[in-house]
């Protein structure tokens, strides 16, 4: 079967902090491993498919090329268009409009996951806990009376931890107003104010459609972050390999959780996955509070499929090889 992997070029990210981090590092500290695109391509080839690569940038010629192409399936790794992350849903809609079969989230699911305030309302409607929140537009505040400090302030319509760093957690009105202004000015979108939940950062990988399966849980251990730094999975922690925060954190299977707690977390993740209409594969980020309560933080459609990332880590813990996971995602997309 002919399978085309669609992925992003770097154009449009040159001005974003961390865009060229790898190039800035000494050679001995650069990561020597395959990219997710290369790993997926190798897996597809091992499974007997004919993979090809097509980089997506902001040029209309690229869309024309996709529309005229004739692969049996497209592995959609595209998270932006022309450097604009809010266009992720539009790209999925484009693939639908031109009749291409593709893996992962639909345009609708991408929209629901991207708009964190809507996602929160949906998961709360389905009986799940999520931190109290308010959306702050320029000039007005809604429901802020329900929130108590400390508060984490995020861009309401961004992903990949953009706009989330140590300064995102605030403890006073002055800090709150300054952070809201920062989000409005830097990201040109509403600010999401969210009750800060102290606890463990748990990732639940989900695989499937009609009967989705929760894979073994993975934890991002934030306990060794520098003193005074809030325990959040911010941009420095996840992506900036130059920082102490990055070096002090790591993800690993959450093997110390008891069976009852594991089942509660997986059940919440499965409910959120289906409520937000994710398909094929996804990841739900949760917080296990010190009280034992499970909070849904956000959904990640089309999570990173790097062999060393949390999704593949969860699959491996459950007995699946990387190639098997890629094969299952391909099969599910073809059955839809």
What are these regions (language model features)?
Residues 1-101, 108, 113-114, 137-143, ...:
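ATP-binding N-terminal substructure of ATP-dependent carboxylate-amine bond-forming enzymes
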Residues 1-6, 66-68, 110-192, 197-200, ...:
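Active-site nucleotide/adenylate-binding loops and adjacent lid/helix of ATP-dependent enzymes
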Residues 58, 171-172, 321:
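Alpha-helix N-cap recognition
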Residues 12-17, 159-162, 242-245, 308:
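Short acidic/His/Gly/Ser-rich catalytic and metal-binding motifs that mark active-site loops
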Residues 122-124, 256-336:
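ATP-dependent carboxylate activation and anion-phosphoryl transfer catalytic cores
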Residues 151, 208, 298-301:
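Short beta-strand elements
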Residues 51, 101-102, 130, 151, ...:
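Hydrophobic beta-strand scaffold residues
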Residues 173-267, 290-295:
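Phosphate-binding site of ATP-dependent enzymes
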């Amino acid at each position: 079967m002919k399978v085309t992997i669609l992925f992003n070029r770097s154009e449009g990210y040159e001005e974003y902090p961390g865009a060229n981090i790898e190039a800035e590092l000494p050679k001995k500290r650069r990561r020597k491993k395959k990219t997710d695109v290369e790993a997926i391509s190798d897996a597809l080839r091992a499974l007997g498919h004919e993979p090809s690569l097509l980089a997506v940038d902001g040029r209309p010629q690229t869309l024309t090329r996709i529309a005229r192409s004739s692969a049996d399936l497209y592995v959609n790794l595209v998270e932006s268009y022309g450097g604009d992350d809010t266009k992720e849903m539009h790209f999925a809609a484009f693939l639908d409009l031109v009749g291409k079969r593709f893996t992962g989230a639909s345009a609708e699911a991408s929209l629901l996951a991207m708009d964190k305030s809507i996602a929160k309302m949906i998961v709360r409607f389905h009986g799940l806990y999520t931190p109290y929140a308010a959306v702050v537009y320029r000039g007005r505040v809604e429901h802020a009376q329900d929130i108590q400090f400390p508060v984490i302030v995020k861009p309401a319509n961004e992903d990949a931890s953009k706009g989330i760093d140590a300064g995102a957690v605030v403890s006073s009105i002055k800090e709150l107003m300054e952070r809201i202004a920062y989000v409005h000015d830097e990201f040109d979108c509403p600010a999401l104010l969210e009750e800060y939940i102290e606890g463990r950062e748990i990732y639940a990988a989900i695989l499937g459609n009609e009967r989705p399966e929760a894979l073994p849980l993975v934890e991002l251990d934030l306990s060794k972050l520098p003193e005074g730094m809030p325990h959040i999975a911010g941009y420095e922690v996840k992506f900036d390999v130059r920082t102490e925060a990055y070096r002090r954190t790591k993800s690993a299977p959450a093997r110390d959780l008891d069976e009852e707690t594991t089942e509660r977390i997986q059940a919440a993740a499965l409910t959120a996955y289906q409520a937000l209409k994710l398909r094929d594969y996804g990841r739900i980020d949760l917080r296990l509070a010190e009280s034992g309560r499970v909070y849904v933080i956000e959904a990640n459609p089309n999570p990173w499929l790097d062999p060393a990332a949390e999704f593949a880590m969860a699959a491996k813990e459950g007995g699946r090889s990387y190639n098997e996971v890629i094969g299952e995602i391909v099969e599910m997309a073809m059955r839809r």
